[in-house]
Amino acid sequence: CDVTSIQQVENLFKKADEILGTPDLVIFNPSARLRGTVEELDMRAAKKAIEVSTIGALSVAKEAATRMLPRGSGSIFFTGASASVKGFANSSVFAVGKFGLRGLAQSLARELHPKNIHIGHFVVDGQISPPLDTNNELDSKLISDEIANAYLHMHRQHRSVWSWEIELRPW
């Protein structure tokens, strides 16, 4: 699904409703990275990349919350990056999208936590090892199964200790 298409996101959730019912957990993971100096940027590509992390995330959050609120429970998690909290040279577009994503998650946490919807943001700070990578030296890359376990752990947190943000890094 192209998360920048509101219609495609709505259709995805309608199809999931038919097959799975109301979700307990929704994870927004899409990202678009565009590197380059500010004067070299293709603004059409920049706009699309920013929309993935902002409009896409907002659209997915709206559809997820609309389904979870009547039940009074659920978790909506967003995958950020180091660029969610600090900018890097030649990565301004990525930073705009990830800062926006983090701001959305922070706002939704304040809005939806009182309604028993757990909102979480994950700062994934490092390279991710492919699932079949047997050459991953200790502390060099994040292991994808362990990232998944971190998401599941946050989802299972007791409401009295809900985290809204967790940083994941291999060292």
Segments the model singles out, each with a brief description of its role:
Residues 114-130, 134-171:
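C-terminal helical subdomain
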Residues 22-23, 37, 68-81, 114-117:
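Active-site loop of short-chain dehydrogenase/reductase
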Residues 37-38, 45-50:
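Substrate-binding pocket helix/loop in short-chain dehydrogenase/reductase
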Residues 1-12, 43:
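The beta1-alpha1 cofactor-binding region of Rossmann-like NAD(H)/NADP(H)-dependent oxidoreductases
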Residues 61-62, 106:
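A short, exposed helix-loop element centered on a Lys and neighboring polar residues
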